[in-house]
Amino acid sequence: MGYTLEQLCDVEAIKDVAKRYSQGVDRLDLEKLKSAYWPDGTDEHGSFKGNAHQFAEFCMTGHAKWRSTSHCIFNHSIDLNADGFHATGEVYNVSYLFQKDAAVLDTWHGRYLDEYEKRGDEWRIMHRVCVHEGTKSEPITPMEIDSSGFRQGSSDRNT
């Protein structure tokens, strides 16, 4: 099936929603994270099941225990509803979480099952289910390259 130009724009806008989510959670940017969800949206994320904006606030404290995180998203599958205002999708995710107080890297593998809604000209998540595939923790060993000359990442808006 071919897409119209408007449908292609909708698909790209939905992909941008996923990017906003990842950037918001990785930078501990509450407003950016909330901007991925409608205020009346919901999220089922492990032990948290409820309002998506409350989930965003939950993430701010939950993710503060790591030095930095990287939510890497890929394999987007998006199905647009014929009404032009609803879509469903699946997004694969591998998250790298660097522990704050130990030289340990936690890696999380999973998928997001999303329901999107378009209001006006804007797409956001209406409902998300986070599916866990696997996790691992491993000690971090130094690489052979000198990384001291690079700007070091952290959980904030600037790096």
Features from the language model and the residues they span:
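Short, low-complexity N-terminal intrinsically disordered segments enriched in polar/charged residues
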Residues: 1-23, 27, 31-36
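Flexible, active-site-adjacent loop/turn segments at secondary-structure boundaries
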Residues: 3-6, 46, 106
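Acidic side chains
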Residues: 10, 26-29, 43, 114, ...
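A solvent-exposed, acidic/Ser-Thr-rich amphipathic alpha-helical stretch
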Residues: 27-95
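A beta-strand edge to alpha-helix "cap/lid" segment located at domain peripheries
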Residues: 64-159
